[in-house]
Amino acid sequence: MRTSKRDSILQAALHVVETDGVTAVTYESVAAASGLTKGGLLYHFPSKDALVLALHEHLAERWDHEMINVLGKDPDEATQDERLAAYARVSAPSATGPELLLMLEASTDSELNKPWRRVISRWIPDPAEIDPTDPRALQKMVAYLAADGLWLSESVGACLLYTSDAADDM
């Protein structure tokens, strides 16, 4: 399957984030990285904000699809334990520095955070719904937090501990 120009632009934008950081994403830098003209970018993304939001949506969707592939079925048909296991298996090996930078950016911008929240809410139990007297529910929340901690560790290269066995143990 041929990569669409839109996907190529998003990959180029991700490359810019990887090499120069989120603030370096401009029409000029992405045009240079993608080999397209600024006009070609404007056709797909009418503003820099639209480009950055599309990058967040693209990565969140990719993450969601990876978890669905690991799960092997529709998340709506899976148990919370199955969804959490898929989340843990996908989180650490998919960790990258650019994704961490984008997640940090999204943490302070409600529009950029929406794609990530959509995915997370599908896979992780709402902390407000956790019964603090239920040990199993608390174990699930700890497993979720451990998966996130492992993702963070892997994304900054601080401690590369991931194995598929570690995810299975969560």
Segments predicted by a language model, with ranges:
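Alpha-helical DNA-contacting segments of helix-turn-helix folds
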Residues: V52-L59, E66
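Hydrophobic alpha-helical connector segments
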Residues: E61-L100
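Amphipathic alpha-helical packing segments from all-alpha helical-bundle domains
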Residues: D64-H65, S107-M141
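Single conserved hydrophobic/aromatic residue that forms the stacking wall/gate
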Residues: Y162-M170
